[in-house]
A protein has these predicted regions:
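Glycine- and small/polar-enriched repetitive beta-structure motifs of secreted/surface proteins
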Residues: 1-378
């Protein structure tokens, strides 16, 4: 019985019993078919070993060659899915796509050698030449772009969109990379998010990082729990963790320091090893290098601070000129904005203590209080 079927070629059917609606064109197609229905095979030995599988489409020499009982697969291209035996609902388009797949289900591979090594993994999507080419058992991965997730073997739940995105990842799971070479060097780092050209480019084992914007966190290798949003944000960070940089060039020079928060264009821009600083506002704390535990809130607040520690500046240009003075508190616009090296001053109010340069241990409370004091102390 071969009801409603079409067969063209030699050595093309096995022992038919109740197969219906099959179409075969080429030598060796349907060589073992018994009862499978609704299959289409075009090309030498395509669907050659199928027995009971139904609703398969194989176009190309040896496509779906080893399929026996699996159904609802589509293979287009030379040797595409040629080793699949019982895997269901897969789609493979391109030469050698999903070539090693045996029992994996619900995979999509489009492009030369995409998902080539996949054996038993399920729910993967690979679009692009060599996308997910070495994946064997990793599940629910998505790679769109040439070489996307190229070295991934067993890791699951990764998403890579863009040329060579996440291409070196081997076992790192739960990563999302969107953009050319985004997270390209990542190997075992997990649960990272990188969006933009070359974001998190050199990250290898760092985990739980978020990088959005051109070259943000470009140099990070092992740092964890960082957030970088904006072109060049945390660009030089290598091993530091728990930093947050939002804005173009924010914390751009940071390498190994931890627990910094910078929000605003070039906020905390030159900080290298200073830790536990908070800078909010354009140019806030922007030339700090090694100063620690400072708080700068407002445009240009603590703008010139370099190595000083434990200062608090709130307001436009508050403590603007401070370089090495420590343990100062300035609240209000222009507050203590001429202070350079003085320490342990407290000033609250608009323009208060504005002209002080080196005076220490002063307290000024109120509008323009002690505005003209320059060097007094105690």
């Amino acid at each position: 019985n071969f009801t409603n079927s079409l067969l063209v070629g030699t050595d093309s059917t096995g022992t038919l019993s109740s197969a219906e609606g099959n179409t075969g064109v080429g030598t060796g197609v349907f060589g073992a078919l018994t009862s499978g229905d609704g299959n289409t095979a075009v090309g030498l030995n395509s669907l050659d070993l199928i027995t009971t599988g139904s609703s398969n489409t194989a176009v190309g020499k040896e496509s779906l060659l080893a399929n026996t009982s699996a159904g609802e697969n589509t293979a287009l291209g030379f040797r595409s899915m040629c080793k699949t035996t019982t895997g269901f609902q897969n789609t493979a388009v391109g030469t050698n796509t999903m070539r090693q797949n045996t029992t994996g289900d619900q995979n999509i591979a489009i492009g030369y050698r995409a998902l080539d090594a996949n054996t038993t993994a399920d729910g993967n999507v690979a679009v692009g030449a060599d996308a997910l080419i070495t994946n064997t058992t990793g599940n629910q991965n998505t790679a769109i772009g040439t070489n996307g997730l190229e070295d991934n073997a067993t890791a699951s739940n990764n998403t890579a969109v863009g040329f060579s995105a996440l291409c070196d990842t081997t076992t790192g799971a739960g990563n999302t990379a969107v953009g050319r070479q985004a997270s390209s060097k990542n190997t075992t780092g997990a649960e990272n998010v990188s969006m933009g050209l070359n974001t998190l480019y050199t990250n290898t084992t760092g985990s739980d990082n978020t990088a959005l914007g051109f070259c943000s966190m470009f140099s990070n290798t092992t740092g964890n729990n960082n957030v970088a949003v904006g072109c060049g944000a945390l660009d030089s960070n290598t091993t530091a963790s728990s930093n947050t940089a939002v804005g173009q060039g924010a914390l751009q020079a940071n390498t190994t320091s931890i627990n910094n928060t910078s929000v605003g264009r070039v906020a905390g821009h030159k900080t290298t090893t200073g830790h536990s600083n908070t800078a909010i506002g354009t140019f806030a704390h922007c030339v700090n290098t090694t100063g620690n535990c400072n708080v700068a809130i407002g445009v240009c607040s603590l703008c010139n601070n370099t190595t000083a520690d434990h200062n608090t500046a709130v307001g436009y240009k508050s403590l603007f000129a401070n370089t090495t003075g420590t343990q100062n508190v300035a609240i209000g616009a222009y507050n203590s904005n001429c202070n350079t090296t003085a320490s342990q001053n407290t000033a609250v109010g608009f323009d208060s203590f504005a002209k002080n340069t080196t005076g220490t241990c002063n307290v000024a409370m109120g509008f323009q209080t002690m505005r003209n004091t320059t060097t007094g102390g105690d």
